[in-house]
Amino acid sequence: MFTEICGKLRTCIYKKVAFSRPLGCNLRQLPVFRDFHNSVSCLRENDKALDELNATILRLQRRIDASKSISLQQKQTQEFPRNEKLLSFLLDNTLRSNVSDKETHSVPPKSKSVLPSEDNILVQRLGVPETSFNKYFQLEPTAESISHKSVLAPEVWKSRLDNLFRYSVPFEKCNLNQVIELVTHLPSSFRASYAKNILDCLKQVCLTPSVYLLNILLHASAKHSTLEETLNVYNAYNQFQLKPDNYTFVSLIIAYSLHKQIVKAFSLLSEMKRLKIEANTHVFNTYIAILYHERLYEQAWRLFDYMKFKSLQSQPDDKTYSYMISVCTAERKVEKALNLYQEMQERPINPLTPSSRTIDAILRALARYPRYHSKFWSIFEELRAEQWKPGAQTFVAFAQLFSYGGQVNSLKRWISRIWSMSGETPDAKTIELLFQYLFRAYSNVKFNQEPSLEQVPNEKTGDDASISSPSNQLSLKLPFLLSSSSGDITKEELIHEAKECYHYLQQYHPTVLSVHLRTTYMSIFKNHGCMDEVKEFYAKSFRPAKLPSSHVVSNQNETTCNKDLPFRDIHVYACAINGASVSNDFAFGYAVWLEYLHCKSYLPEVLNGDKIEFEITKSMIILFARNQFLHLAVKLLNETKDRHWKWTRRSLGIMHKVAFLSQDKPALDLIEEIVLD
């Protein structure tokens, strides 16, 4: 009888305490379990105590039954999904996801009828009326609440957090669950700015944070705070005697990489080894992402091979293959990207099904090169037959496809569809991206070839008719929707259309006219040999590169209009010099090059800056050679031969021809010395 009663009591205590235990707390560590085990020896030979214990069990059972009935009523009225693993979701009316996306954490119930009034003390101190708690914190399990998006404006959040931390003991009478709930609803930037306050307040009331809470604060600090502030949050793990996990180190890796300390980011592997934490796939994926963004492709491949052939706990997943396909795209190795896409599906152990992330990566890789466009359509048709649903990045892949292929008509219809999809004007970032692709398509149109077969997936005549109808209010805001989208386009019509699109942006969306978008627009004239338009646009749509104030000569005649223009960057200079080289306009090209040399050391750093500088040098050598300034070409080549650029016979072909015709032996010897066989 004793064993049976003890078993019943243990079960009741588990059921009773499991609803209210703090996050990360082991049930056996609770006082009720310690008291239970300490009292077992006293109960073995005491019949009266056994009777009292049996009565206690009955009372506990009645309370559990009452709790079950309340939970059942809430479930019937709110229609939550039935899943025993999400018991906290059913009881608490909200879903909390760990950063690992694999664990769920229970939090206290939120309805006023369940929580005692003193449990809402954090809400009161924030200055939020208790009846409006759901409104401000999105306690209903919507998609936004699951992703921790806040409905409050930043200034409102700051005001309410100031109200909270104005108290002498802000977290007095609060438990850890309530603090975690507050932090998960904070915008990421506020988690970072108030991380120190939150940790200090936890120490003030002797509350030990969980690793989950510290990971949230550390991840936000890594993205929004200084490196010193991030490391201060990391020190809290030692202060509270908590062991970091893989996701702790992912945040530290991100922090070091954002502050350009790549070596320190990789040295964290030694720290993980010291703490006996085995790096998982998520950690290595973060490293590969850093190597990809830093253009350290060889190291990314070495790490990928380690994951494949040596590591047992960090096998490549779908995200790993997505990054490596992007690496192949950056290296212009499309065949290798296709091999990876095939490998992940056919590997003998644990084959992977491509997700939208991987599919979009391979489609973007194929879209950049017209010779692979047939393969693009082949993969897309296979996916469409399998009822695959494209995502937002798939629209970008199609825009790239039409843009790099110079398929203007298809791209116009595609942009029209995206534009009218939501029934309202897209945001500025989307508009800039769409017109970036459109201007590139205008640049890539080839007039002296047979027209390619332009196709748009799921194209319906009815949809196009509704989009291009003059009665459609959106269509009146797009200059190309009312124009014909069939038949070949002439060079004059293309230039006219491009100018209309640019004037449309000037009138309706002037804020999207960035330096990058203006440069792409200027490349339309450059690629089609319209150097007069290039010169005019170069002079009127940019200002010379920004110099330090000590190098600037004040110009009283500079108008307010000119002050609103963007400064030229290396992309602008490269586009203008390349255009001058192709059209052999020495006066314009040489003037732009001199301005570039004057401003070169003050230009902002850009991605692939060394590659762009190489293109500028090649264009100027061609321009010098064509205009019989061979000594200037030799001088420029001598000055840059230590840059480890890959010179070929083709890139120096014109210079070699001029040197050969003029029998300039030093120039010929220099070319032979520098050219890679």
From Swiss-Prot:
Q: Name one GO cellular component term.
A: mitochondrion
Transit peptide interval: 1-43
Q: How does it assemble?
A: Binds to mitochondrial small subunit 15S rRNA.
What name does the UniProt record give this protein? Mitochondrial 15S rRNA processing factor ppr3
Quote the Gene3D superfamilies the UniProt record gives. Answer: Tetratricopeptide repeat domain (1.25.40.10)
- Write down the species: Schizosaccharomyces japonicus (strain yFS275 / FY16936) (Fission yeast)
The entry sums up its family as follows: Belongs to the CCM1 family.
UniProt function note: Regulates mitochondrial small subunit maturation by controlling 15S rRNA 5'-end processing. Localizes to the 5' precursor of the 15S rRNA in a position that is subsequently occupied by mS47 in the mature yeast mtSSU. Uses structure and sequence-specific RNA recognition, binding to a single-stranded region of the precursor and specifically recognizing bases -6 to -1. The exchange of Ccm1 for mS47 is coupled to the irreversible removal of precursor rRNA that is accompanied by conformational changes of the mitoribosomal proteins uS5m and mS26.
Report the domain of life of the source organism: Eukaryota
Bridged cysteine pairs (disulfide)? none
| Cellular location(s) | Mitochondrion
Signal sequence bounds: none
Pfam families found in the cross-reference section: PPR, PPR_2
What's in the keyword line of the UniProt record? Mitochondrion, mRNA processing, mRNA splicing, Repeat, Transit peptide
Q: What else is known?
A: Involved in mitochondrial-nuclear incompatibility, a major determinant in reproductive isolation between species, through hybrid incompatibility of Ccm1 and its interacting partner 15S rRNA between yeast species.
Please, one GO biological process term?
mRNA processing
